[in-house]
From Swiss-Prot:
The lineage of its organism: Eukaryota, Viridiplantae, Streptophyta, Embryophyta, Tracheophyta. Residues 22-85 bind DNA. Probably binds to the DNA sequence 5'-TGAC-3'. Belongs to the TALE/KNOX homeobox family. It is found in: Nucleus. Pfam families: ELK, Homeobox_KN. It comes from Zea mays (Maize). Residues 1-21 form the ELK domain. Keywords: DNA-binding, Homeobox, Nucleus. This is Homeobox protein liguleless 3. Disulfide bonds: none annotated. It comes from the Eukaryota.
């Protein structure tokens, strides 16, 4: 009975929280075109794959990604694939 009463009272709030949580957990691959552009930059700069802020802005404009996505892609790429020589 208490559970039903609480659900009735807070169901709107709970559904908003649930949808907000699901939005934030959305996860997926970057678009293929964007990955291609980033990989081209990566292959050209493999010895030191640390793009400047200007590079990141340019890559974001070319790919349509957020600067944070560009930054995260390079962090993950270096962690997974880069062997400093």
């Amino acid at each position: 009975e208490l559970k039903e009463m609480l659900l009735k009272k807070y169901s709107g709030c709970l559904s908003r929280l649930r949808s907000e949580f699901l939005k934030k957990r959305k996860k997926g691959k970057l678009p293929k075109d964007a990955r291609t552009v980033l990989l081209e930059w990566w292959n050209t700069h493999y010895r030191w794959p640390y793009p400047t802020e200007e590079d990141k802005v340019r890559l974001a404009a070319m790919t349509g990604l957020d600067p944070k996505q560009i930054n995260n892609w390079f962090i993950n790429q270096r962690k997974r694939h880069w062997k400093p020589s």
